[in-house]
């Protein structure tokens, strides 16, 4: 989502609260819970899941392996649910022509760097750069080159913008900031 006026451009960045992340976390949780229940059923010799009789899966080695996969899956699933609840990667980009300042804010993981806040002067922006890598997994990323600081990505690598969309976005931003566009 973007909000623009004559002097300010604010672009909201979606973090980890995407539908695909919710789906993967849910599927992984259910699958790993199933694996753990099958492993536990084979250990106890009781039927905790009604799909099969417990005698069909021997605890050593199948039950141990399934329990291990279930526990590992629950750890990965809990990691995904934590990133979703913390909304890691979300934030905003604010370009203020009137004040001459660019502010980039992102939420990170809890701890010392939970809030990532970068502030630059607009006069230090050298260019807006588009990096294109074609192939099976095409990647188009928009960067802002800052004098003495390097490049700062403005779009996610998994955003999958079409060439026309990334060019449009780069052209509008470069025009707003009055800086050149570079393509790599």
From Swiss-Prot:
The UniProt keywords, alphabetically, are: Chloroplast, Membrane, Photosynthesis, Plastid, Thylakoid, Transmembrane, Transmembrane helix
As for subcellular location, the record says: Plastid, Chloroplast thylakoid membrane
Q: Reply yes or no: does the keyword Methyltransferase apply.
A: no
Major place of localization?
plastid
Membrane topology type: Multi-pass membrane protein
Question: Which segments cross the bilayer?
Answer: 19-39, 57-77
**InterPro entries per record:** PSI_Ycf4_assembly
GO biological process per UniProt? photosynthesis
What is one cellular component GO term in this UniProt entry?
Answer: chloroplast thylakoid membrane
Family statement: Belongs to the Ycf4 family.
Q: What does this protein do?
A: Seems to be required for the assembly of the photosystem I complex.
- Entry-linked HAMAP family: Ycf4
The identity of this protein, by name, is Photosystem I assembly protein Ycf4
Question: Source organism lineage?
Answer: Eukaryota, Viridiplantae, Streptophyta, Embryophyta, Tracheophyta
The gene it comes from is ycf4
